[in-house]
Amino acid sequence: MGLFESVKSIDWEQESFPTYQDLGFLPLFAVFFPTIRFLLDRFVFEKLASLVIYGRMSTNKSDNIKDRKKNSPKVRKFKESAWKCIYYLSAELLALSVTYNEPWFSNTLYFWIGPGDQIWPDQPMKMKLKFLYMFAAGFYTYSIFALVFWETRRSDFGVSMGHHITTLVLIVLSYICRLTRAGSVILALHDASDVFLEIGKMSKYCGAESLASISFVLFALSWVVLRLIYYPFWILWSTSYQIIMTVDKEKHPNGPILYYMFNTLLYFLLVLHIFWWVLIYRMLVKQVQDRGKLSEDVRSDSESDDEHED
C-alpha cells in the first residue's frame, strides 16, 4: 500500500483522548519541515526568486554573476517569505478544514461543554485535530532552530523567539490538558494574516509595489480583526470567564494552576500582538505619507538591502 492509500485509509473522524505517546510524532514533523524547505529552496524558490527579481536575462549571465544573484539579500529573503507563505497558507487551510464545521468554531461555549453530555476535560479529539496539533507543534519546534541558524536576523529576534517558544508550550500544554478546542481556533486565527504579510514582502522584493501595498493593507486589517478584536474579546473572554461559569471547579483541584498557566501564556501572546501592531501602525502611517508606497519590511532587517548588486 502506497503513502497516498495509507493516508486515505485513515479514519480522520475517529475520536480518542490525547496521550503523551502522541507527542512521539512531534519530532517527525520537526524534521519534515526543514527537509521540505530545503528541497523547495533548492529546486523552486531559488529559481523563482531569480526570475521575478532579476528577470529572464539573468539566466544568460556568467556563472559568477548568477552565484552573486543567488546569494543576494533580496533572493535570500524572498525564499524565506515564499516558504513562510506556503506554510501559513497550508496551515490556515488545514485549521479551517478541521474546525470550520465543529460547533466550537462559532460558539466558544462548546470549548468547555457539549456536544451532548461532554464536559471538559472529558472531550475526545478527532484524528484530524490531532494531526493539526502535531503539524503546528512540529513547525514551531523547527522554527525555534530556524530562527537561530537559518533565518535572516531581524531587529525583533528576541520577540519572535519568545513568540515561538510560547506558542510551542501552548500547543503541547493544551494538547495534554485537553484544551484543543480553544487551541484549534487560535491556530486558525493566527495564520491568516501572515499569508498577506509574506505575499506583501515577496511583492516588495520583486518590485511589485502596488501588490505589496494592497497586501500590507489586507495584512493590517486582518491583524486588527483577528488578533486585536476576535482573539481578546471572544477567545480570551472564554478562557478567562466563560470557563469559570461552566466548569465545576470542585471536581478539578488542579484546575486553578492550569487556568493561570494557560491564560498567562495566552495573554502574553496578546502583548506580542500589541507590540507588533505598533510597528504595523507606524508602517501604515509611513505608507500614507509616501502615497501608498510600501517603504520597508514591517520588521527591519539587521542587514541592508541596499548593497550593490550587478
Curated annotation (Swiss-Prot):
GO terms for molecular function: sphingosine N-acyltransferase activity. It catalyses: (4R)-hydroxysphinganine + a fatty acyl-CoA = an N-acyl-(4R)-4-hydroxysphinganine + CoA + H(+); hexacosanoyl-CoA + (4R)-hydroxysphinganine = N-hexacosanoyl-(4R)-hydroxysphinganine + CoA + H(+); tetracosanoyl-CoA + (4R)-hydroxysphinganine = N-tetracosanoyl-(4R)-hydroxysphinganine + CoA + H(+). This is Ceramide synthase LOH1. The lineage of its organism: Eukaryota, Viridiplantae, Streptophyta, Embryophyta, Tracheophyta. The modification Phosphoserine is found at residues 300, 302. SMART domains: TLC (SM00724). It is an enzyme of class 2 (transferase). Essential for plant growth, promotes cell division in root meristems. Catalyzes the biosynthesis of ceramide sphingolipids with C(16) to C(28) fatty acids, structural membrane lipids involved in membrane trafficking (e.g. early endosomes) and cell polarity (e.g. polar auxin transport related proteins); mostly active with t18:0 and saturated very long saturated fatty acids (C24:0 and C26:0), such as long-chain base (LCB) phytosphingosine (t18:0), lignoceroyl- and hexacosanoyl-CoAs. Mediates resistance to sphinganine-analog mycotoxins (SAMs, e.g. Pathway: Sphingolipid metabolism. Its main location: endoplasmic reticulum. Inhibited by the mycotoxin fumonisin B(1), a sphingosine analog mycotoxins produced by pathogenic fungi. Repressed by divalent cation such as magnesium Mg(2+), copper Cu(2+), zinc Zn(2+), manganese Mn(2+), calcium Ca(2+) and cobalt Co(2+). It is found in: Endoplasmic reticulum membrane.
